[in-house]
Structure formats: C-alpha cells, structure tokens
C-alpha cells in the first residue's frame, strides 16, 4: 500500500522552508484536489484493492478471453429492467434480464475504460493555474524571504547564524542586509510590479473557471448524472428505491460475445459480467461530488475576498486586519498608513505576501523604512529620478521605534540629523550626501 502512494508523498510533506505565494483557496486547488485525483487514479489502476476489474461468466468461452473482450467492448444493461425497487438478495439485479434486441432499449457503459485517464488529466488541469502563477510570479518573493521564516530567533544570535538540519537561521547582520535588499527591491520594482497583482487575480479566476469546466465535463462523462449524484445518493440511502449509484455504476452488466462455431456459423454467447471496478468508481465520484461542492463554495468566497481587497486595500484598518490574518503581530498604524497611501494594488499584495513569509520582528523593520522612502506611484512617475533626489527629512508621524536595530546606518544617520536646527541648518550637506551608498 505504501508503494502505491509513494508517488504522491512529495506533495504531502511539511516543509518549514516553503515560501508562501498564494492563499489557502489556491492550495485547495493545486495541492489537495491534485492529490485527491492522483490518489483516485492510483486506486483505479491498482488491482491490489479490487482484484480483476471485470469477471464475466459464459458457457463455452474461456474466461480470460471473454473478460478481455467485454472490458474493451462496452457492456450494457436493459433499460426496461431498471425498475424502481431496490436490489435485494435473491432478486434480479437492475438492468439484467432477457431482452429483444429489436424492441428493448439498452444502455451501454463504456466510461469505465477511460476513468483513470480522465482523473489523471483532471489532476493536471487543477495544477495548471498554479504553474502559470508560479511562472508569472517569477520567484520574487522567494528571492527576498528565503531563509527568513525563523528570523524571530535572530535577535538572540547577534553575529552568529544557526543551522538546524536544512533550516538556516541568519545572524543579525545577515538579517539587516536582507532588510536592505527588500527595501531596495520594493522601491526599484514599483513600476515592474504593476502586472503582479493582475496576474494573481487572473490565476484565481482561472481556478474558478477550471473548476466549473471539470464539473461540467464530469457530468457529461457520466451521462448527465453527476450534478445530482450527491443528493440522490443521500436520498436513496434511507429509502427502498433503486439507488442512483446502481444506475450510474452498475455492478452487474450484460455482454454479447460472438465467435465462429465448428461449422463456420456465428455463435452468440450471452455473458453476465461482474464489474468490480464500479465498486471503486462509485466511491470515488461520490467523494468528488462533495469535494467539488465544497471547493466551489470556498473558491467563490475567495474571489469575494479578492474583490474586497481591490476595494479597500488603502484602508489602514482593513490592511492591518488583513496582515494580522496573514500572520499575527502588531504593526505601527502611522507607519502602515504612510506605506499603503503610496501603494497600488500590486504593491499591496506584494506586502501581504511578504508579511506571510516574514516574522513580526523583521516585517516591522521593513515597514519602518518603507514609510519614509516609498515613492508615490500616483505622483512619482520616474522612480529613477526619485532615487537620485535628496532624501526627504523625517516627519514626526514616523516615530523611531526604540526596539528596532539600526538598518542602513549612513542613510538613517543623515535622516535623524537632517532636520533644521536652531542655527538655520537645512538638512544634510552636499559632502554628506556624497557619502551615501549608490
């Protein structure tokens, strides 16, 4: 059994170094649904649990021959014999009985040949939006935050880093350098990040479209019975009526086998086939019905949440609670307001995922420095010109956080001493500005 599911083990392992670039709704699509469909494919193709997929009984025909013939040639049931009485031991199975080919209508069942292929293809379809988003995202978040998931312990390490297995906890000096990298990247990519948020929203909408397509396709694949499969299965569970599962996934079917007799005439053999494969099929599709229903509700709620972020991302209260939901922690409201006032939606989403990957200790440092250095995308059309301009003197609404270590000390030193003095000094001199790192 463990060997059967070894191929999906890599999608279930817990990794502390994994970088978050999407939300839980996205993960339900490309991780959980992908794994569920992959496991279903393995179950269908494995004979360890259900034995032979089909076993047919007929006098005068070798079993392996007729089994193979009836598996690749659709079996059928007689519609007239699919009555509304539940099957009981000793009674005739639904759809089985004598029939006249010229008068009676039959229902052919050929889908079971394609079930593993369809399930595997659907698993790939649920992974495609994630693959597209991962390509569009380009590893930007990972490049900035990789190795910083446990940086809350950095304050105790000072100048020495700590490695625990594959997990590396950086020293204080390394963390400070990473803060400077994040700050510079946010400023440098103000314009380049314009499409970042649009691609994320498109990928989330693509998840919903793909889910609706898979539900529609599955319904057609099962002859239009999938949409109502869940409610009908629950209803028939406690009634004497014929279960819809016995109609969609018949356990016993008929098969006609033709062969040449000794004299050359064609002989027809009426075979009764036990469909062990359908016992597994009905369980899989019942689970998929309830999972798809749950996933559809969650996906719609996720898109409603995305609409709220589009409408209220510049509201400081909404942002504070959103960041707290991403990862608990307290942030300075004045500094946060200063940053989001200068953010478009893409930059806001970039900050949101930074918060999802950074500790409170490090994210406070990032917000503190962005508060006074972030250009305004609505007014600062040339980011390069902004970077070449003299730094703006620090304002009182951006108070210095006493609990944070100094980052980029030459720049902050000039900021703190650059306010007008009693002697009429007007900020840093030209010689001081020349000392700033380029």
Curated annotation (Swiss-Prot):
This is Innexin inx7. Residues 418-431 have a biased composition (Low complexity). It is a multi-pass membrane protein. Residues 45-58, 134-283 are extracellular. Expressed around gut lobes in embryonic stages 15-17. GO terms for biological process: intercellular transport; medium-term memory; monoatomic ion transmembrane transport; phototransduction. Keywords: Cell junction, Cell membrane, Gap junction, Ion channel, Ion transport, Membrane, Transmembrane, Transmembrane helix, Transport. Residues 1-23, 80-112, 305-438 are cytoplasmic. It is found in: Cell membrane; Cell junction, Gap junction. One of its GO terms (molecular function) is gap junction channel activity. GO terms for cellular component: cytoplasm; gap junction; membrane; nucleus; plasma membrane. The chain crosses the membrane at residues 24-44, 59-79, 113-133, 284-304. InterPro entries: Innexin (IPR000990). Belongs to the pannexin family. Structural components of the gap junctions. Residues 381-402, 415-438 are annotated as: Disordered. It comes from the Eukaryota. The gene is Inx7.
């Amino acid at each position: 059994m463990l060997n059967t599911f070894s191929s999906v083990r890599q999608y279930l392992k817990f990794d502390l170094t994994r970088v978050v670039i999407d939300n839980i709704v996205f993960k339900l699509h490309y991780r959980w649904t992908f794994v569920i469909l992959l496991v279903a494919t393995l179950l269908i193709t494995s004979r360890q649990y259900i034995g032979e997929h089909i076993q047919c009984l007929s006098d005068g025909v070798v079993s392996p021959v007729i089994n193979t013939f009836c598996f690749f040639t659709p079996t059928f049931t007689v519609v007239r014999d699919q009555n509304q009485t539940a099957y009981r031991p000793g009674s005739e199975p639904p759809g089985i009985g004598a029939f006249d080919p010229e008068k009676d209508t039959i229902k052919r069942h050929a889908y079971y040949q394609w079930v593993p292929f369809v399930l595997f293809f659907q698993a790939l379809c649920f992974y495609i939006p994630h693959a597209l988003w991962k390509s569009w995202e380009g590893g930007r978040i990972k490049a900035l935050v990789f190795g910083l998931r446990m940086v809350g312990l950095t304050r105790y390490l000072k100048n020495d880093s700590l490695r625990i297995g594959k997990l590396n906890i950086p020293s204080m000096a390394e963390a400070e350098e990473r803060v400077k990298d994040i700050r510079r990247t946010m400023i440098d990519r103000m314009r380049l990040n314009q499409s970042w948020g649009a691609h994320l929203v498109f990928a989330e909408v693509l998840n919903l479209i793909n889910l609706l397509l898979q539900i529609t396709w599955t319904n057609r694949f099962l002859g239009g019975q999938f949409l109502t499969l869940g409610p009908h299965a629950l209803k028939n569970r406690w009634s004497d009526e014929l279960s819809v599962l016995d109609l969609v996934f018949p356990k016993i079917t008929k098969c006609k086998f033709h062969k040449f007799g000794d004299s050359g005439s064609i002989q027809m053999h009426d075979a009764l086939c036990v469909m062990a494969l359908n016992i597994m099929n009905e369980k899989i599709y019942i689970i998929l019905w309830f999972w798809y229903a749950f996933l559809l509700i969650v996906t719609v709620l996720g898109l409603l949440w995305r609409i709220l972020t589009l409408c209220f991302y510049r509201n400081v209260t909404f942002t504070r609670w959103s960041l707290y939901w991403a990862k608990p922690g307290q942030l300075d409201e004045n500094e946060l307001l200063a940053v989001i006032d200068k953010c478009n939606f893409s930059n806001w989403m970039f900050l949101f995922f930074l918060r999802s990957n950074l500790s409170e200790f490090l994210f406070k440092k990032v917000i503190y420095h962005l508060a006074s250095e972030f250009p305004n995308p609505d007014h600062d059309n040339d980011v390069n010109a902004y970077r070449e301009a003299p730094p703006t003197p620090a304002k009182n609404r951006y108070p210095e956080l006493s609990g944070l270590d100094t980052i980029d000390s030459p720049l902050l030193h000039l900021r703190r001493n650059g306010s007008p003095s009693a002697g009429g000094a007007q900020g840093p001199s030209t010689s001081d500005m020349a000392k700033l790192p380029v």
